[in-house]
Amino acid sequence: MSWGTELWDQFDNLEKHTQWGIDFLDKYAKFVKERLEIEQNYAKQLRNLVKKYCPKRSAKDEEPRFTSCLSFYNILNELNDYAGQREVVAEEMGHRVYAEIMRYSNDIKGERKSHLQEGRKAQQYLDMCLKQMDNSKRKFERECREAEKAQQTYERLDNDSNATKSDVEKAKQQLHLRTHMADESKNEYAAQLQNYNAEQHKHFYIVIPQVYKHLQEMDERRTVKLSECYKGFADAERKVIPIISKCLEGMVQAAKSVDERRDSQIVVDCFKSGFEPNGDYPFEDYSQHIYRTVSDGTISTPKQESLKPDPRVTVGKAKGKLWLFGKKPKGPALEDFSHLPPEQRRKRLQQRIDELSRELQKEMDQKDALNKMKDVYEKNPQMGDPSSLHPKIAETTSNIERLRMEIHKNEAWLSEVEGKVSQRSERRHSAEANHLVAQGRESPEGSYTEDANQEGRVQPQPHAHPEFDDEFDDDEPLPAIGHCKSLYPFDGNNEGTLAMKEGEVLYIIEEDKGDGWTRARKQNGEEGYVPTSYIDITLEKNSKGAVTYI
């Protein structure tokens, strides 16, 4: 199958077909360009998406690292790698497909133009030969007619008796001339005809088949190039499939790494305050003196002091802790983290001690290295001056002392926190035990069994007017055990808290029990809890000695 033999007379159609082939090549190149632009935009959008949702945390950020968050961040990293592979696909399409098609399209356009020009030249040469043959043919025809006319004239004059001899001779010469010219035209026509036939045979069997063969080869190469580009287009995707599969596998592994129990423990570690829950409210039996009057026949002074609940563990204190489940009052961050709950304070102090210990180890290693270098300099003075290291050694020694003092100070704070938490737990268990013992001593009739030990421990306080005790017990204010001065303003929005201004002087009626809150009273008698870290406390000597907390 050859275009030169099968399509010898289809030059115009072949010209249109080859032009269509080049247009189709350009169309596919445009498709590839738009396809790689889609890949580039897709990769860019993926990277922007990853950048948008990646965590923006500083090196000192202590955000809890939940496994679900870590898994999501790992998925974002894998997605970023996936976006990189989409960029590789776009780059591969651009280099191996689009650039190759554009280069080949320019080459094939020039080649097609050359082959078509060659075919047109061959056709023009054949047309010229045909025209020359036609001219010689018409000339031969014309000369033959002239010779025929000359012969008719000669025969007419030769048969005419009136014609002169000179006229006959002249007609005869004209006849010979026309006959000779006709013979020459005949020979020329024969030569032109033979030449045209030869050129026509050469044109249709040699020149045109060669031109069409080149066009056919060009078109077939174009088809092969398209096939290669189709394959390269698919190979660009196939080459990144293993890496993309690894990215997807990484996402699956990240999903499997989610641990709900660990996340729950992180929540506990992050928000555990170390506070103890409020104890049970004691039963306040106001009917004891009634039953004792009926049974004994006398009216005795009830042991109201022993029955009166401790105001420091009742409503006031419960209200003071409501911030644990509401909006925690904010204050300035202190060096000893006393503004934090006990458990969080303990964790932060331990973290700081660990950091300081690492810094101390670095400084000690540096000091050892400097001492070794100093020894080397002393043994080999040509290597350096030992005295040049003295400032650095002194600075390192100073840093070591400073870090040791910091560690000692933070360890003291840590011991204080751990001691307070332990004491608070012991107080709570002791209070619960006493409450259970008191309940166990109550008789079914509502009276109390006399206990010499208990009577020795708990003595009723005499009152000048016992008949008014029940009426004013709840309103009797607690005695002040010291005073304090507020260092910072406090809004006191939560129930049970006391608002105060900076520099305001308050009375202390209950010390901090390790929860970071101190009970105080204003000059106008208003009571409530204030943050211990917000005030400068001075206790009276007759209570526990003059002690100042800052």
UniProtKB/Swiss-Prot annotation:
Q: Which domain of life does the UniProt lineage start with?
A: Eukaryota
**How does the protein associate with the membrane?**
Peripheral membrane protein
Taking every annotated instance into account, which residue ranges of this chain make up the domain F-BAR? 1-263
Q: InterPro entries from the entry? A: AH/BAR_dom_sf, F_BAR, FCH_dom, FNBP1L_F-BAR, FNBP1L_SH3, HR1_rho-bd, SH3-like_dom_sf, SH3_domain
Show which residues constitute the signal peptide.
none
* Sections of the chain in a coiled coil: 66-258, 334-426
The record's principal subcellular location, in a coarse class, is cytoplasm
- Domain named SH3: residues: 479-540
Q: Which PROSITE patterns match?
A: F_BAR (PS51741), REM_1 (PS51860), SH3 (PS50002)
Q: Where in the cell is it found?
A: Cytoplasm; Cytoplasm, Cytoskeleton; Cytoplasm, Cell cortex; Cytoplasmic vesicle
Q: What is said about its interaction partners and assembly? A: Homodimerizes, the dimers can polymerize end-to-end to form filamentous structures. Interacts with GTP-bound cdc42 and wasl/n-wasp.
- Record note on domains: The F-BAR domain binds the phospholipid membrane with its concave surface. The end-to-end polymerization of dimers of these domains provides a curved surface that fits best membranes with around 600 A diameter, and may drive tubulation.
Query: What protein is this chain from?
Result: Formin-binding protein 1-like
* Species: Xenopus tropicalis
Encoding gene per record: fnbp1l
